[in-house]
């Protein structure tokens, strides 16, 4: 209550440390919708935000998959997924300056543009993580021991999933066809080609399969964003919403009010 909308952004990093970039984007979109500018964001900003969200999704699923595999005795998969997750954090650090507490979005845009060569590194990552996903698939999906320990285990029915308030892959694992990116498209998701996987019985095996396929679809989205990424501004051109650049504020006091300055040239005021 005692902060501006932008000052609250660092708190969103802590809501889910596995996907801080997605938290940043969700909060910014909520405030922008209240301000009535969510449909006015620059196209480049929207593409970069989608890239951030899908990187966050891959990062979270890699940890979930690795920890899950280790819990059922497949340590090798854990090592593979954490190796790929480290690459995600290297990309995030190059983009935001931090690995976890990113604080990357701003109301009306982003804190900074993509650094030079970053999309090339992202393209390299999508190829490498795709190979890692398929390697995990070979190790687990048709592994009899893994199937015995996950199939029919932890079943959550459709009604239970709704009653429990489940979201994301845990909800879709119970054969509920609901994903905000399709049900209520935001940013530029309606311009991208991707599919949403759903489970059949709602057991641990279904939830595993969904996370695997969601990572494949995230890679698909990232590749499209890299190919279509437009040039242009990353922030709204609205001084009432977007803060001036920090370098300008430090060098020119008037930048705080976007160069609006009253100048007196010493004329005498009219009589009366």
Features from the language model and the residues they span:
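Metal/cofactor-centered catalytic core regions of large enzymes
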Residues: 1-272
